[in-house]
Every structure is written in C-alpha cells, then in structure tokens.
Amino acid sequence: LNQEMQNKIEMAKGIVADVLETVKRRGAFQAEASYSEGSGLSVSTRSGQVDTVEHNDDRSLSITVFLKNNDGEELSKGSASTAVLDPQAIALTIEKAMAIAALTEADPCMGLADKSRLATEFRELGTWQPQTVTADDLIQRALEAEAAAATEGVTVDQSAAQTGESFSVYGNSHGFLAHRLGSTASASVVALAEQDGAMERDYWWDATRQVDDLLSAREIGQKAAARTRQRVGARRVASGAYPVLFEAPVAKTLVGHFLQAISGSALYQDASFLKDALGNRIFPDWLTIREDPFLYGGFASRNFDSDGVQTRARHLIENGVLSGYLLSSYAARRLGLEPTGNAGGSHNVQVVPNAGEFTDLLQQMDTGLLITEVMGQGINLVTGDYSRGASGFWVENGQIQYPVNEITVAGNLKDLYAGLQAVGSDVDRRSKIHTGSWLFEHMAVAGEG
C-alpha cells in the first residue's frame, strides 16, 4: 500500500472506532459501523468525439445499533447513514440510528455475528492496485476501440472506458476492526448494424482489476463489430423443443438464479424452489460448483463478509449435490443453521467444466439453438419456472447457420439444472461468476407458429 492509502485507512478506522465507543456510551447493547470511500474516472466517445468525462469521489458512513428490549432477551435494530462526515453530521446519524432502534420491533434473530466466527486470518488477495491512468489515457483507449469497431456496415453507438478504486472499513462492538480494498477497470463498445430497415445491436466489453490487464482497445472494438455484424438478418424459428446452448456470458445468468435460490433471504421467506434441498441432487453427478473467496485478484475476493465473519473456500455443489447455502448471521438464525460467511453475497463462484471449448459444444449439440442474449424478468424463484425472451443463432451440423431473434425459451430451473448436458471450457471470468457455456438436451422454444 502507498502512504496515501495507508493514511486514509487509518483515518477511517479512527472514525469507526470513535462511533462504536460513542454508541456504547449511549447505551447500545451492540453496534457496527462501516466506512466506505471510492473514486473513479469514466469517459465515453461517439462519432470520433469525446462524449462524456466524469469523475466521482464518494464517501459514506453507515451505523447500526442494537438495543435490548425491556426483558433483555431480544434486540431491536436501527440503522442510519451519512455522506457528510463532520462531527455534527456523525453525531446526528448516531441519534437517528438510536431513535430508529428504539421504535423498531424486537427480533430474536437480530444482533452481531458471534464473536468466535469473526475473521482472524487476513490473506493478501490482490484486489487493489493504484490507478494511475489519466482521462486522456482513457479517451485514447475509447477512441481506438471505436475506430476498430467502425468498419463497413457497422456504426458505433458508444465506446467507453472506466477505472475506479475503493476501500472500506468495518468494525463492531465485539472488537473487530478491519479493512478491504478494491480497484476496477473496464472498457466497452456498443455497435449497430442495419439491413432492410432492421437495426441490430451488440457489444463487447472487458473488466479487470487493473487497466493494463484489459483486452486491447482494438480487440474489444473488433469483437463488438463482429458480433453485431453476425446478427444482421435475424429471423424467428418455428416453435418447438430444441437442444439449446447458452453462451458463457448468458450461462452466468443461470448460475445467478441458482445463487439467488440458495441465498438466506429467499430461503427464510419461503421464496425459493431450493428450500430444504441441502443434500439433494440438483445437478448431474459430474457437476461441481466451488466458492473461492481467496482467489487472487478475484472480483468477489473477501477475507470477511459484511458481518465480519471469516470467509472460507468450499463447494456449493459437489458431484451434483447441494452442499451449502449462502447465509448471513441473521439468515442462519432464522433458519436454525450456521452462518456461511455470505452476508453481502457469494464470493467467486466457479463452475467446473466437463467438456471442451465452445466449438466442441456446437458439435456436441449438432442441431439446435445457440443463445447469446436473454431479456425480460420471467423467472419465478418460488416454483423455478423460467421463461425469457432470447436471441442468438440457429445451428446445424455443429455450424452456425443464421441469426435468430424474437423467440422465447422456457422450462423449469429444477429440470434444466438436473438435465444439464455439458459445461464448456470457454470460461468467462469477467465477474464474480466463472463459467463456460451450458448445453441442454432440449428446451421449449416459442417462435413462429
């Protein structure tokens, strides 16, 4: 860490420690506080000209207090936050949190995580590198990507580049006080192509922890143009049941639905088709899904969760069997289970491939639909019913034949997960979910007729 960042972290730790001491004196039974600070730079270009240049610099402090009710058995909770960090604003925020807690109904599951579960192991995770690029650097990158995309038949809607860095400090009245750091860089191009009055749009993007690790501007622009050009002349296919291959970036959404279904809030609200499914076979026996909070440079690498609980590497799915939920301390108490270190979400979820590259999956599918985009919100997590608008390509003999749009793919997530045929080695690592493409034996497709 450079001296500037060290100084910022020490200042933030001092603020959090002072808040915790103050609310303790004010009579809070337990308390937690979180300070976060971030800065970023983003630019966009259009038609070879700079469109926007934006700089953000944000700070915030959130305070949560827990008060004992009259019989001392249950706790009530009050939270308040502020973006103004002078002593008067912080004092007012404490007042608000205390007042809200005094008015809130007590809950036997409220309170801090058990002290024994708080993190004591802090690994170097490679999640932060100082961002030294200037606005001119990002503008040059965006213009170069735009120029690479603006080839015959393709126009560029927008080219963009962004960098950011942030840190946060979390502390609670159990004596826990720790920080975490993050930096991000991303670049994207959105392109358009037209044929016979029909406009098609596609894009490509990349995201890393450090701008120097991004795909080159030229590659991003060329990929956006190629994908857009491929979509020209799209048509519908006849309704029916077909083999379906979800391209890796779209397959991530299927992993996302699984993660939602095993999250604590969905489970204790009886809003998940995977409630009471621990130990049940959900996927084929060849499938393993891991969670690795210690992945170096991972987008969701964490030594501790939002409750301060120690994270751990584990299997969510092992040999097709559901072996873990995603539980905060509160959710665990509601469900009568143990917390898993997932307050705030999952950490670097990795689906282990069992098949070859993308072209191998096309050959394995032989004839069917390749889905490259889904849209709409047709997912019912209570029942697992799935229905989304989609576009992509028709495939025959393992070869892409023509683009397809204005179709709907449907099924039930229970059946889809259980019937998964293959996961490709074409792993997309541009987010906290890492997976290759997913192949299904058949899905219901609504198109023409």
Predicted features, each with a name:
Residues L1-R302, S306-V309, E318-V321, Q399, ...:
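Active-site bordering "gate/hinge" segments
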Residues Q210, A261, K275-G449:
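Dual-mode signal for accessory low-complexity, basic/Gly-rich regions
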